[in-house]
């Protein structure tokens, strides 16, 4: 049984759910989920949680993501990227100097309004479905944070490369449109690649072709591409549970007078097997989530 995290280097034109469907077929495992949607035009790091590890998707500690994006000046589209319909074109009257001048304004906590072409739901309906019907609705701005933004040059005229490290829920398309507006320009996103997602980086990622080749080579080759679910929680302190405490965790029973500081822990048993997460409050140890699958 496949249990773990496969980090995929998502290709262009695939949706994040397309990737999950592919992995379900490869693993013959229905419990597959991804951590952080990438638009079809985007490429890069997409962590896919498989088997029992799928329970960790909503428990990730680090939601920070890093993107390499291209801003194209002189046009604006309905989707905020070059896959959309061009709404307006305009002469480009600003460049690198103006871009560098406005970038510091976008650092730090801020409110961002999700674009109409997004998976955000209004009354149970995804915004992108409404947008495809020509319907525009009011959206509430949401808190995000831009932790770092760096200029990476201009590979072609009127296009600028930016590397952005940001919080969960940040729409890079919207950020680039806002940056262009601050420059007094129209702008859209011409390319996007995610280089990190939480603790996972491009170095962890595998192409779908590599996944298929591993499947063809056999179960051991496929398992070798998986990262353990414990990798999600590596920043938490480690607690090693003795057999009595391990049994308490399995049974959902608290352990009183536990000799450790209050806090959240990742837990292994005496044999080094990762069991799950636990919390200690006032000397009482309680299980939060188990990931070990017992036969």
Question: Where do the PLM segments sit?
Answer:
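Catalytic cores of RNA-modifying enzymes
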Residues: 1-167, 174-206
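Accessory RNA 3′-end/elbow-binding domains used by RNA modification enzymes
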Residues: 1-9, 13, 17-34, 38, ...
């Amino acid at each position: 049984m496949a249990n773990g995290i496969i980090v995929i280097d998502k290709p262009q034109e695939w949706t994040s759910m397309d990737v999950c469907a592919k992995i379900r077929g490869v693993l013959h495992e229905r419990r597959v989920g991804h951590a952080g949607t990438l638009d079809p035009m985007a490429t890069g790091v997409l962590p896919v949680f498989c088997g029992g590890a799928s329970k960790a998707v909503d428990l990730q500690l680090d939601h920070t993501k890093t993107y390499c994006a291209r801003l194209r000046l002189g046009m604006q589209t309905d989707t905020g990227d070059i896959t959309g319909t061009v709404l307006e074109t305009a002469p480009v009257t600003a460049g690198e100097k103006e871009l560098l001048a406005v970038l510091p304004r976008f650092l730090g906590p801020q409110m961002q309004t999700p674009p109409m072409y997004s998976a955000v739901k209004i009354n149970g309906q995804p915004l992108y479905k409404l947008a495809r019907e020509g319907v525009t609705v009011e959206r509430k701005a949401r808190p995000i944070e831009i932790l770092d933004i760096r200029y990476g040059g201009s590979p072609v005229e009127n296009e600028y490369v930016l590397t952005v490290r940001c919080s969960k829920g940040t729409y890079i398309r919207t950020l680039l449109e806002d940056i262009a507006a601050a420059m007094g320009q129209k702008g859209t996103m011409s390319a996007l690649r995610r280089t990190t997602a939480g603790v996972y980086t491009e170095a962890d990622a595998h192409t779908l072709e590599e996944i298929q080749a591993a499947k063809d080579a056999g179960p051991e080759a496929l398992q070798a591409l998986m990262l353990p679910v414990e990798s999600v929680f590596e920043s938490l302190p480690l607690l090693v549970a003795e057999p009595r405490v391990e049994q308490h965790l399995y049974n959902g029973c608290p352990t009183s007078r536990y000799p450790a500081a209050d806090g959240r822990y990742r837990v292994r048993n005496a044999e080094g097997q990762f069991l799950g997460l636990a919390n200690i409050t006032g000397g009482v140890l309680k299980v939060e989530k188990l990931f070990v699958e017992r036969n």
